[in-house]
Amino acid sequence: MTLAKRIIPCLDVTAGRVVKGVNFLELRDAGDPVEIARRYDDQGADELTFLDITATSDGRDLILDIIEAVASQVFIPLTVGGGVRAVDDVRRLLNAGADKVGINSSAISNPQLVFDASQKYGSQCIVVAIDAKKAADGRWEVFTHGGRKATGLDAIEWAKKMESLGAGEILLTSMDRDGTKVGFDLDLTRSVSDAISIPVIASGGVGGLQDLVDGVKIGRADAVLAASIFHYGQHTVQEAKRFMSEQGIAMRLT
């Protein structure tokens, strides 16, 4: 049986509001996180990803109250990331109602965190987020702190290392494509998908429904994440699922 591919709307949150930017900058308000999460649940989203995009760079605490409010209204799997620095942060997020926890900047400063968290809570709830940008030498470099800090790490090698330490999924964002609506970086997505055996969630650049199809068929992603096309009413999740299903992709249709 073919495993169904997933559509995951992404809620980037700062100061308690959902926002959307271009290339990780120029943030525009998109609404209240609880309202938006409820709408996507009603539309049949497979999961939601909730990223506190300024938590790490600002050093702010986890926004547990918002997560508790969202989790009380939403009954699909919820991945939450942003500001996760210790195994205890993972515990607090899971207790607040998250099903999975995203680790990004802290995975680089402390890779042991990925191992320890996956050992304690299981790989299935540890998602490592990789924000990658094409470098001058043709490889993809990993960035942290909301895309502000270069690491010198190769994205493909880093994904392999994270898998070996116990990550259950990779959330792979092309910073070059973020918010541009020109489609995923399919070379990046396919290169990482081919290099590891855990699921890859493609992120960054969706402008239309065909981009979602391409992420799966060409990029070989297991799930596709999008924000702009859903937040501003361009498409519903149901439309996206139907379109992907019509293109021969196994989807959970509601």
Curated annotation (Swiss-Prot):
It catalyses: 5-[(5-phospho-1-deoxy-D-ribulos-1-ylimino)methylamino]-1-(5-phospho-beta-D-ribosyl)imidazole-4-carboxamide + L-glutamine = D-erythro-1-(imidazol-4-yl)glycerol 3-phosphate + 5-amino-1-(5-phospho-beta-D-ribosyl)imidazole-4-carboxamide + L-glutamate + H(+). It is found in: Cytoplasm. One of its GO terms (cellular component) is cytoplasm. Its main location: cytoplasm. GO terms for molecular function: imidazoleglycerol-phosphate synthase activity; lyase activity. The active site is at residues 12, 131. CDD domains: HisF. Keywords: Amino-acid biosynthesis, Cytoplasm, Histidine biosynthesis, Lyase. Pathway: Amino-acid biosynthesis; L-histidine biosynthesis; L-histidine from 5-phospho-alpha-D-ribose 1-diphosphate: step 5/9. Its EC number is 4.3.2.10. InterPro entries: Aldolase_TIM, His_biosynth, HisF, IGPS_HisA/HisF, RibuloseP-bd_barrel. One of its GO terms (biological process) is L-histidine biosynthetic process. Coiled coil: none annotated. The keyword Amino-acid biosynthesis applies. It is an enzyme of class 4 (lyase). PANTHER family: IMIDAZOLE GLYCEROL PHOSPHATE SYNTHASE HISHF, IMIDAZOLE GLYCEROL PHOSPHATE SYNTHASE SUBUNIT HISF/H IGP SYNTHASE SUBUNIT HISF/H. IGPS catalyzes the conversion of PRFAR and glutamine to IGP, AICAR and glutamate. The HisF subunit catalyzes the cyclization activity that produces IGP and AICAR from PRFAR using the ammonia provided by the HisH subunit. Belongs to the HisA/HisF family. Heterodimer of HisH and HisF. This is Imidazole glycerol phosphate synthase subunit HisF. It comes from Herminiimonas arsenicoxydans.
